[in-house]
């Protein structure tokens, strides 16, 4: 009886060791994409994604996978000139991405959960469920719809539209288009490098805006203070509207 129990225990341990050898693996796989890419489509449920432009007009994808047992195929696909990051790498597998694309590439789609870092791309129209969003040196219009997470934007040459639910929004070096920012909970900080129309709506959080002069200014807060160091030029060519339900509003001239 004892020998039988010992045999069963040995088999259980051996099976556990066998499973351990296949479970919880990580890998970094780099792929060169031969197609000429001009659009990246975000379609992953859970992924940290970093996209930057290259100087040699090439596209590469590095998949950082965490998986059990075996890898199954690639976690991306190519359709014509569109690179799709779908995170589809098999059972109990997740993939993060580091992507390099040609200049002039736009980013569209939806990232369910995870951080999003985009540098030098030519425009963005994307949704993000949960995670931090960092944008830098974007050369076209940006449209973001966010559920939860902070947003940081540096040096944008285009129109900015951001709608957030929870998280701080901070943007500087804005030029080339109107600015529309709305969030339910979180602070909003904007620094405009050139004058353009600005519309900011907050519910709970402070609003700080730095901009050139020459604005027709309207402000409103139900619970908080307003400090307007920008002035109000009734003959100004651009309008600035800043409202929040609960929070302070500060306007400064750069």
Task: Give names to the regions the model predicted.
Residues 4-21:
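Hydrophobic membrane-insertion alpha-helices, especially the h-region
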Residues 108-154, 161-163:
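Right-handed parallel beta-helix
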């Amino acid at each position: 009886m004892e020998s039988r129990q010992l045999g069963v225990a040995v088999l259980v341990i051996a099976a556990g060791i066998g499973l351990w050898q296949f479970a919880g693996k990580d890998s970094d796989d780099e792929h060169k994409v031969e197609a000429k890419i001009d659009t990246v489509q975000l379609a992953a449920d859970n992924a940290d994604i970093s996209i930057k432009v290259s100087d040699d007009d090439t596209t590469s994808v590095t998949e950082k996978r965490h998986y059990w047992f075996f890898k199954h195929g690639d976690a991306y696909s190519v359709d014509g000139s569109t690179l799709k990051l779908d995170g589809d790498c098999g059972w109990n597998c997740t993939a993060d991405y580091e992507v390099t694309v040609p200049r002039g590439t736009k980013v569209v789609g939806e990232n369910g959960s995870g951080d999003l870092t985009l540098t030098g791309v030519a425009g963005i129209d994307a949704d993000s469920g949960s995670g931090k969003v960092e944008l830098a040196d974007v050369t076209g219009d940006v449209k973001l719809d966010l559920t939860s997470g902070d947003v940081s934007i540096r040096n944008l040459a285009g129109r900015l539209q951001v709608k957030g639910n929870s998280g701080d929004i901070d943007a500087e070096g804005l030029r080339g288009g109107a600015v529309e920012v709305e969030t339910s909970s979180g602070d909003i900080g904007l620094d405009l490098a050139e004058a353009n129309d600005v519309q900011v709506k907050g519910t709970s959080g402070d609003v700080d805006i730095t901009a050139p002069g020459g604005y027709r200014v309207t402000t409103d807060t139900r619970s908080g203070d307003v400090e307007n160091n920008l002035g109000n030029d009734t003959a100004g060519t651009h309008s600035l509207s800043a409202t929040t339900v609960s929070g302070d509003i500060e306007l400064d001239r750069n």
